Swiss-Prot record:
Pathway: Cofactor biosynthesis; thiamine diphosphate biosynthesis
Broad class of enzyme this protein falls into: transferase
One Gene Ontology term, aspect cellular component: cytosol
EC number annotated for this UniProt entry: 2.8.1.4
Pfam families given in the database record: ThiI, ThiI_fer, THUMP
CDD domains from the UniProt entry: PPase_ThiI, THUMP_ThiI
Reactions mediated catalytically: [ThiI sulfur-carrier protein]-S-sulfanyl-L-cysteine + a uridine in tRNA + 2 reduced [2Fe-2S]-[ferredoxin] + ATP + H(+) = [ThiI sulfur-carrier protein]-L-cysteine + a 4-thiouridine in tRNA + 2 oxidized [2Fe-2S]-[ferredoxin] + AMP + diphosphate; [ThiS sulfur-carrier protein]-C-terminal Gly-Gly-AMP + S-sulfanyl-L-cysteinyl-[cysteine desulfurase] + AH2 = [ThiS sulfur-carrier protein]-C-terminal-Gly-aminoethanethioate + L-cysteinyl-[cysteine desulfurase] + A + AMP + 2 H(+)
Major site of localization recorded for this protein: cytoplasm
The protein's name in its UniProt record: Probable tRNA sulfurtransferase
GO BP of this protein: thiamine biosynthetic process; thiamine diphosphate biosynthetic process; thiazole biosynthetic process; tRNA 4-thiouridine biosynthesis
Length: 385
């Protein structure tokens, strides 16, 4: 008998038709990268994936964070005969100390002499005969579900042996995006959600030294590292933004400051994406959450983008976003009290319904191309693996 980890990938991958093999290969590649310093063996048994290792806890901790993996199951491998299956099933039920149970069988090996229903009945009957009045069958609400997978070998486990994973699609299968990362709660969640859909994720942070401290920058670097735990690696570009902000403050109306700054952030992200061959922009904006995130404000920001702008949080409540932040371990870092460039120089009464034509007129006073290029030329680059 061997204890193995059964890897179940997202059902969405099954629907990829002729591209299914590409997604499977990428997912296997990503799993192997996560386990590069853990001794392990990858086993395929009739289209099921298993991992064998002396460090099962270490494997579980890493693989459950691989995008595309839906669930992990700690299974016991036995010989593919009924006697071995029933004995291991009895052992699992005894260990569970449950008062009721149900058996579910998946017989992929069609050479096995019993079908799935017959195996479930026979294993259940054997357990009842051995445990007598200690336990009963409950097919609707059992305390313990016993699962039997019959392939080349047989694999037995219970619902207590299941570990939920992150799901999604294999990282790197769906293009690339530049996430406008701040030190807040929202943008790290947006980065995570895009990565979860298989999008290669890069980040840009706008740093307003000396108005924002080095601790604010360190906070954003830490957020990028946390998101990077779910990806192969993550790159953070730190762009100096003070000169742009001061020029806007000097030459533009106060109520237009926020939206013009947002337009410059979008321009910088687009130009940086062009240089790095990144296909899209992602922000952590949610409709109506703050004054600049009205429908009109978002349209005015989009106006300066030359590529798709994704907003994965657009219809989410703040509480929902905070829940995800807690789940992915960014929340405690995000709430550290260090200001970013979005929280300084905020006008008392920002425009909530800006118009593109008004912004174009206001920006004529600014040397847009020179400001954008200078900021990018002076940026810092950090790579976290």
């Amino acid at each position: 008998m061997n204890n193995l980890i059964l890897v179940k990938y997202a059902s969405e991958i099954f629907l990829k038709g002729l591209n299914k093999n590409k997604f499977e290969r990428k997912l296997k590649e990503n799993i192997r990268k996560k386990l590069k310093d853990i001794d392990h063996e990858f086993i395929t048994d009739q289209n099921r994936w298993f991992i064998k290792s002396e460090d099962l806890d270490g494997v579980i901790e890493r693989v459950k964070k691989v995008f595309g993996v839906k669930e992990l199951c700690l299974v016991t491998q036995v010989e593919g005969d009924f006697d071995s299956i029933k004995e291991e099933g009895l052992k699992k039920i005894k260990e569970s100390k449950a008062k009721s149970f149900k058996v579910e069988t998946n017989r992929a090996n069609k050479k096995f002499p019993m079908n799935s229903m017959e195996v479930s009945r026979a294993v259940g009957g054997y357990i009842l005969s051995e445990l007598g009045d200690e336990i009963e069958v409950d097919i609707h609400n059992p305390e313990c579900k016993l699962y039997v997978e019959i392939r080349g070998n047989a694999y037995v486990f219970t619902d207590k042996d299941k570990i939920k994973a992150v799901g999604g699609l294999p990282y790197g299968m769906n293009g690339s995006t530049m996430v406008m990362l701040s030190g807040g709660i929202d943008s790290p969640v947006a980065a995570y959600l895009m990565a979860r859909r298989g999008v290669e994720t890069h980040c840009v942070y706008y740093h307003s030294h000396p108005y924002t401290s080095e601790r604010a920058k360190d906070k954003v670097k830490e957020l990028a590292k946390i998101v990077g735990r779910y990806t192969e690696k993550i790159t953070l570009y730190v762009v100096p933004f003070t000169e742009i902000q001061m020029d806007i403050i000097e030459k533009c109306r106060e109520d237009e400051l926020t939206i013009i700054m947002r337009r410059f952030m979008m321009r910088v992200a687009c130009e940086l994406s062009e240089r790095k061959k990144i296909q899209s922009i992602t922000t952590g904006e949610s409709i109506g959450q703050v004054a600049s995130q009205t429908m009109e404000g978002l349209m005015v920001s989009n106006d300066v983008s030359d590529r798709p702008v994704f907003r994965p949080l657009i219809a989410m409540d703040k509480e929902d976003i905070m829940d995800i932040a807690r789940d992915i371990d960014t929340y405690e870092t995000s709430i550290l009290p260090y200001e970013d460039c979005c929280t300084i120089f905020v006008p008392k009464h920002p425009k909530t319904k800006p118009r593109v034509k008004d912004m174009i007129i206001a920006e004529r006073k600014l040397d847009i191309e020179a400001l954008v290029n200078k900021a990018i030329d002076e940026m810092e680059t950090f790579i976290f693996e």
